[in-house]
From Swiss-Prot:
Principal EC category: ligase
The protein, known as: Proline--tRNA ligase
InterPro entries: aa-tRNA-synt_IIb (IPR002314), aa-tRNA-synth_II (IPR006195), aa-tRNA-synth_II/BPL/LPL (IPR045864), Anticodon-bd (IPR004154), Anticodon-bd_dom_sf (IPR036621), Pro-tRNA-ligase_IIa (IPR002316), Pro-tRNA-synth_IIa_bac-type (IPR004500), Pro-tRNA-Synthase_IIa_type1 (IPR023717)
Keyword vocabulary terms for this entry: Aminoacyl-tRNA synthetase, ATP-binding, Cytoplasm, Ligase, Nucleotide-binding, Protein biosynthesis
Family per similarity comment: Belongs to the class-II aminoacyl-tRNA synthetase family. ProS type 1 subfamily.
One GO process term, biological-process aspect: prolyl-tRNA aminoacylation
The protein's assembly and partners: Homodimer.
Subcellular location(s) of the protein: Cytoplasm
Record's function text: Catalyzes the attachment of proline to tRNA(Pro) in a two-step reaction: proline is first activated by ATP to form Pro-AMP and then transferred to the acceptor end of tRNA(Pro). As ProRS can inadvertently accommodate and process non-cognate amino acids such as alanine and cysteine, to avoid such errors it has two additional distinct editing activities against alanine. One activity is designated as 'pretransfer' editing and involves the tRNA(Pro)-independent hydrolysis of activated Ala-AMP.
Reaction(s) catalysed by this chain's protein: tRNA(Pro) + L-proline + ATP = L-prolyl-tRNA(Pro) + AMP + diphosphate
């Protein structure tokens, strides 16, 4: 590409509306421009990067036997009504009504549609396993788009779907896709973790996320300081100490604490033996319709936070969680939420493991303005059912007993799921097995956030001068920078010789034949992040030399002009 024919669109200053490093650099490097909140125009430089990311993904998908298809953006709403995800996604769905009053959804994902499609395409187990994928723009009505292309209303994804006659086949394909994703991200030189994760709105039996460490990330992954333990914060756990302390030697006299002002903890903090970590809060949540009780009381330490995902695994509890209203709390306990306690309740009580090994603890009394202090299990209160229902904290012991847990912010770049029969049951998709009977189809799905990957790579690869692209996805592999291109025949001839060599060998080269100051050109090339540069000047050429630069190593050296071709070829083979 000749620079004088190229739209660079670079900016000298950081735009005031950028809210993270990747966003600022993508704007400054002329990769994107904002259209509206959460939607972006991809400029020539951005599109070159995007196409290279897609090429890597397509090559690896081909290697694992996946076939590419293309599904519509518009999906029939009734399919989403069947799965009930129109409710769980809620206002995040873009819904459209056509002139005949038919309702559609702009797809954030395609599980419903692919299941509906495959129902009429597969008849026998002999056609399985099968992997289909597409690369397509998705839509989500984000309430607050942020961090540039990390959280947007419109984004590009690779979504793949696999189909199986049994779980063994699904497990095999799941592991294949897991390894394929590792290959994809390694080719992009991306630092990442594959972590056990919550299946969330997708549902299913098992899932893993691929997370790119970044301080801009909205996700949190949990790691052990001394082992290979890794998990998303939603599913992370620690060693559970469910030892109940019975030693009466440690018991203090039970007392009531009166609250005479609005600041509960200011009052309690003056009470002997009071600690937030030794105080139990009680929260009422609603149960599912089949339960004989309307509520369940949840007990958790005051300094801990309930993990809704873990609670959702308890069969009786409604999910998403529905908390009791002020009036409902008053009706069943006679007090307000600040004073609820697990005493004389007519419905089940569930406690986190961390609660059960407390002694001389503080709890609500179910009497307004009163708490009980120095309470103990079995002596003053019955022992509840115990579960792991909290978020882990930094410093908690690792569940494998090796080291402590630490937290790392990250960007979710991919997610794979064992869906099982979740969608095929809903749509009654059955297939003939080996003995001629009909079995419900088993499915997996596998997503990669293509546009988000680009932001994650920039977050991990930048310096004060701009982006440092890995070779595999850089918009150009090499920049040929002639000094006085339009004045020196010698410089022009050598520049064009190198440029034509690159074209002949299918190497993405940028010949900067613009009439502008050299320092501006060099700054622009560094900002864009082109990995290699050749600077050609008449002064150096008189000695048969040129200057060679490597962006990622910050290398600058003078080399023989004829040695350039070998270096370029070697770099292109990396």
């Amino acid at each position: 590409m000749q620079a004088r024919k190229y739209l660079f669109s670079t900016l000298k200053e950081t735009p005031h509306n950028s809210d993270c490093i990747s966003h600022a650099l993508m704007l400054r490097a002329g990769i994107i421009r904002q259209n509206t909140s959460g939607t972006y125009i991809w400029l020539p430089t951005g599109l070159r990067i995007l196409k290279k990311v897609i090429r890597i993904i397509k090559n690896e998908m081909k290697q694992c036997g996946a076939m590419e298809i293309a599904m519509p953006f518009l999906q029939k709403k009734n399919l989403w009504d069947l799965s009930k995800r129109v409710i769980t996604y809620g206002q995040e769905l873009f819904q459209v009504t056509d002139r005949t009053n038919k309702k559609f959804i702009l797809g954030p994902t395609h599980e419903e549609m692919i299941t509906y499609f495959i129902k009429n395409e597969l008849q026998s187990y002999k056609q399985l396993p099968l992997i289909l994928y597409q690369i397509q723009t998705k839509f989500r009505d984000e309430i607050r788009p942020r961090f540039g292309i990390i959280r947007t209303k419109e984004f590009m994804m690779k979504d793949a779907y696999s189909f199986h006659i049994n779980m063994l086949s699904l497990e095999k394909t799941y592991n294949l896709m897991y390894q394929t994703y590792i290959k994809i991200f390694k080719k992009m030189k991306l630092k990442f973790y594959a972590v056990e994760a919550d299946s969330g709105l997708m549902g299913g039996l098992k899932s893993h996320e691929f997370q790119a460490p970044s301080n801009t990330g909205e996700d949190v992954i949990v790691l052990s300081t001394q082992s290979n333990y890794l998990a998303n914060i939603q599913v992370a756990t620690s060693i559970q100490n469910n030892h109940i302390k019975y030693s009466t030697n440690n018991y203090f006299k039970k007392i009531k604490i009166l609250r005479n002002n609005n600041d509960i903890y200011k009052k309690l903090s003056n009470t002997p033996n009071f600690k937030k970590s030794n105080t139990i809060k009680t929260i009422l949540v609603k149960t599912k319709n089949f339960s004989k009780h309307l509520f369940v009381a949840i007990l958790i330490r005051e300094d801990h936070t309930i993990n809704e995902y873990k609670l959702s695994k308890i069969n009786e509890i409604e999910y998403p969680l529905i908390f009791a209203s002020k009036q409902e709390i008053l009706n069943v306990t006679g007090t307000t939420k600040d004073f609820i306690g697990p005493i004389n309740l007519d419905f089940p009580v569930i406690a986190d493991f961390s609660v059960i090994n407390l002694e001389n603890f503080t709890i609500g009394s179910n009497i307004t303005n009163k708490y009980f202090n120095n309470m103990n299990w079995n002596k003053d209160i019955s022992i509840p059912q115990t579960y792991d229902i909290r978020y882990v904290l930094e410093g908690d012991p690792s569940p494998d007993g090796a080291g402590e847990l630490k937290m790392q912010k990250s960007i979710e770049i991919a997610h794979i799921f064992q869906l099982g029969k979740k969608y095929s049951k809903i749509m009654n998709v059955k297939i003939q097995n080996k003995i001629g009977k009909k079995d419900t189809l088993i499915m997996g799905c596998y997503g990669i956030g293509i546009t988000r990957i680009i932001a994650a790579i920039i977050e991990q690869n930048n310096d004060k001068n701009g982006i440092i692209w890995p070779d595999s996805i850089a918009p150009f592999t090499i920049a040929i920078i002639p000094v006085c291109f339009h004045k020196s025949t010698l410089v022009k001839q050598q520049s064009e010789k190198i440029y034509n060599f690159c074209k002949k060998n299918n190497i993405d080269a940028l010949l900067d034949d613009r009439k502008q100051n050299l320092s501006i050109t060099l700054s622009e090339i560094e900002l864009i992040g082109i990995p290699y540069s050749i600077i050609i000047s008449e002064k150096l050429l008189k000695n048969d030399m040129v200057e060679y630069r490597e962006r990622h190593k910050n290398v600058k050296k003078i080399i023989n002009k004829n040695h350039v071709f070998k270096i370029i070829l070697n770099n292109s083979l990396k």
